Amino acid sequence: MASGREEFVYMAKLAEQAERYEEMVEFMEKVSAAVDGDELTVEERNLLSVAYKNVIGARRASWRIISSIEQKEESRGNDDHVTAIREYRSKIETELSGICDGILKLLDSRLIPAAASGDSKVFYLKMKGDYHRYLAEFKTGQERKDAAEHTLAAYKSAQDIANAELAPTHPIRLGLALNFSVFYYEILNSPDRACNLAKQAFDEAIAELDTLGEESYKDSTLIMQLLRDNLTLWTSDMQDDAADEIKEAAAPKPTEEQQ
């Protein structure tokens, strides 16, 4: 008979196959409760990440669509529609806050304290940065400022460990650089810092590409491609700032991040 932990992992995989990600989150939260201070396995932490990424990803996509419609209706002067849209957007934001709060509590109370290896510490600190960044995407005023500060602190802690303990080609280190650079570009409006960080990570990985093991080659090269795509997009934006600001206001271009 499988242990409770193994049973929950199996059920999480089943929920993933069925694309029932809210239930996948519930099963993986049960797994993290069952480990009793131990570290999650690589498979378990990846399942947890996939579960939360899908649950939050659906709401982030909804929020972007609704915000875009809100801008259009505002420009047309449809005040009644704008009021209804804002109420609906607020509902989505409540869901986003709840999801982020859930994983951030789990990270702070269990996952980060139990992390022993360098790659797991970076993995969870990056995750902490990611979910504070998702809060910063829609929060305003002091709440946005706080979320941005928490994001920066988590990413910097992860970066310190990654630079000391992980190879430049390690997919977790590359994924951190990708998402950290997106944070600089989208949340802090610092395209220079974003480009510098992404370029440095890409160049350092290219220099050691021949050391890449077969198992992580695909993951690492995929993230390197995303870094390069963002650099291309951002540098073209910076070269034509005035025109691009108009384009972005009408139809924001998605910046790629690690899924």
UniProtKB/Swiss-Prot annotation:
Top-level taxon of the source organism: Eukaryota
SUPFAM superfamilies assigned to the protein according to its UniProt record, in alphabetical order: 14-3-3 protein
Compartments in which it is found: Nucleus; Cytoplasm
Keywords, sorted A to Z: Cytoplasm, Nucleus, Phosphoprotein
Coiled coil: none
Phosphoserine modifications at: 67, 109, 190
Modified residues (Phosphothreonine): 211
Record-level GO cellular component terms: cytosol; Golgi apparatus; mitochondrion; nucleus; plant-type vacuole
GO biological process entries: brassinosteroid mediated signaling pathway
Database matches in InterPro entries: 14-3-3, 14-3-3_CS, 14-3-3_dom_sf, 14-3-3_domain
UniProt family annotation: Belongs to the 14-3-3 family.
Functional description taken from the UniProt entry: Is associated with a DNA binding complex that binds to the G box, a well-characterized cis-acting DNA regulatory element found in plant genes.
UniProt subunit comment: Interacts with CINV1.
Protein name: 14-3-3-like protein GF14 omega
Organism: Arabidopsis thaliana
Gene: GRF2
